[in-house]
């Protein structure tokens, strides 16, 4: 299966870009992790609403980057540009570049479908399909042409193990996913995402609808997943960002107000507005 999906993930290398001049590198330039996403001078409009303004941000491989900020600041809009889901909004327009592995995802020759294979997404509300757990997990691989039952069985087990829920569900694979608890549904959605072997997982408030115990399980899972995946997570929960992330970007009014190592953001922020936000003075 890995070979089959790898074959589907070959993107043309004919349009590459030098990212060495990107003027907003991650705060720790000695970091051994490679840049996987480089956002350069990104502006985005919904009609006349200038939702993102001059965003410059580098995301590093195999790290968890938290995106924080008050409601309406552009957090969710930003991560939806990273897999071009934002283009589902008819009035949207963009300027600037987002480089994914040195290729501009807005280039006309860049495949949106391939991008969304490489970059999975988990939403705020658990959104399993109205199908069995098994069919939820195999949905993506089947779209990619995998039909062999043995291979699909292996994908299901591997994905559910990756989402730390195999032992809970291995005897219930043909149960409707809607019958699960909210926390279990969200982990099934994470497993469904893992089944297509992405490199990056975008998470938009993945625990906001969950109880504290389920939230803790998802947070523990996210920290395990960064060994194999790059995680970019929007959260309103300051404690969550501080607990799980390596880097934190604070968005305010469509701008990146501050971006730094999470420890520094929460212990010694450089910007007064960042300090005011994380201390609860506004937001």
From Swiss-Prot:
The lineage of its organism: Bacteria, Bacillati, Bacillota, Bacilli, Bacillales. PROSITE patterns: ABC_TRANSPORTER_1, ABC_TRANSPORTER_2, PSTB. Its EC number is 7.3.2.1. Residues 1-20 have a biased composition (Polar residues). It comes from Staphylococcus aureus (strain MRSA252). It is found in: Cell membrane. Keywords: ATP-binding, Cell membrane, Membrane, Nucleotide-binding, Phosphate transport, Translocase, Transport. It catalyses: phosphate(out) + ATP + H2O = ADP + 2 phosphate(in) + H(+). This is Phosphate import ATP-binding protein PstB. GO terms for cellular component: plasma membrane. Residues 1-32 are annotated as: Disordered. Residues 37-278 form the ABC transporter domain. It comes from the Bacteria. The gene is pstB. Part of the ABC transporter complex PstSACB involved in phosphate import. Responsible for energy coupling to the transport system.
